Swiss-Prot record:
Residues 109-122, 135-144 have a biased composition (Gly residues). It comes from the Bacteria. One of its GO terms (molecular function) is enzyme activator activity. Plays an important role in DNA replication, recombination and repair. Binds to ssDNA and to an array of partner proteins to recruit them to their sites of action during DNA metabolism. SUPFAM superfamilies: Nucleic acid-binding proteins. NCBIfam families: PRK08763.1 (NF006445), ssb (TIGR00621). GO terms for cellular component: nucleoid. This is Single-stranded DNA-binding protein. GO terms for biological process: DNA recombination; DNA repair; DNA replication. Homotetramer. The keyword DNA-binding applies. Residues 5-109 form the SSB domain. Keywords: DNA damage, DNA recombination, DNA repair, DNA replication, DNA-binding.
Amino acid sequence: MARGINKVILVGNLGNDPDTKYTQAGMAITRVSLATTSMRKDREGNNQERTEWHRVVFFGKLGEIAGEYLRKGSQVYVEGELRYDKYTGQDGVEKYSTDIVANEMQMLGGRGEGGGGGGMGGDRPQRTQAPRQQQGGGGGGGGQDYAPRRQQPAQQQSAPPMDDFADDDIPF
């Protein structure tokens, strides 16, 4: 039987500076809010904007890169997967959250917008034998057990220095 597909692609702007924290093992976990805006026409033919806010989480090396280079207002391309979590808040009430767990990132926009630079690919986090946490399905799908994810060592890709690069050098 074929496996399902859980893939999300977003292009949007950061609504906050990245929040990076590290696990006891030293793995970076970076969280951002990403805004995407779509346009549609209403019944009268007027353009209507709708902005959606997405919680995006970067792990490992990709989390370090996101935390270092992204800033509020930066435009970014993100690929990842949807993750539904269920947890008990400090008030004892069960809460649900939906995150995009990023495994690819591309900074967009010019230098003034906090973008530029090459693509950043994150290695897919792998399952570990660590204590498992219940991951609930939002609404009606049951939960699945997922271990906290750990990053595989990434191969370093060196990009040429961008110090002497000007927008006028682009031939198009």
